[in-house]
């Protein structure tokens, strides 16, 4: 996502966003200042959120929630996480108030993150074989309302 953002910024001339730093400053009580924010604070929030939410995508994959549909769901979680933090701290405004181009760029970058993270998480989880959800679905392929749970393992 970061590489894609940097390429997009070169092409569009869009400046760096300091929203991640401002959110972290408000969450932690760090002092705020106008204008450009310290790069380490910006990156700490940027990469910290990515790492923490990446764990969630890994849990999804290990559980058997894999593939593009799971990555799309995760992308929504990633977008929602940003909006909760930005709006709760007063740093951001609801996306419905943003210019459409800014909204499109944000959604695009989060989608890249969501699908790349999903591909990596899915590949790593696949090394352990099907997840519990996939094993359950394989017992009776298709859509069924009466699919009971898998038996407990090790008992």
Regions found by a protein language model. Give the residues of each.
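Short amphipathic, positively biased membrane-proximal segments
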Residues: 1-155
């Amino acid at each position: 996502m970061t590489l894609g953002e940097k390429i997009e910024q070169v092409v569009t001339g869009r400046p760096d966003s300091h929203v991640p730093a401002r959110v972290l400053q408000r969450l932690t009580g760090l002092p705020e200042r106008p204008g450009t924010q310290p790069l380490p604070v910006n990156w700490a929030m940027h990469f910290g959120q990515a790492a923490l939410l990446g764990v969630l995508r890994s849990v999804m994959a290990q559980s058997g929630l894999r593939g593009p549909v799971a990555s799309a769901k995760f992308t929504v979680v990633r977008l929602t996480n940003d909006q909760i933090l930005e709006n709760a701290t007063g740093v951001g405004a609801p996306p419905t108030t943003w210019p459409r181009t800014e909204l499109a760029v944000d959604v695009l970058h989060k989608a890249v993150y969501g699908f790349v993270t999903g591909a990596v998480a899915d590949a790593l989880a696949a090394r352990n074989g099907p997840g519990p959800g996939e094993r359950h679905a394989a017992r009776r392929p298709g859509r069924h309302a009466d699919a009971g749970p898998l038996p407990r393992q090790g008992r």
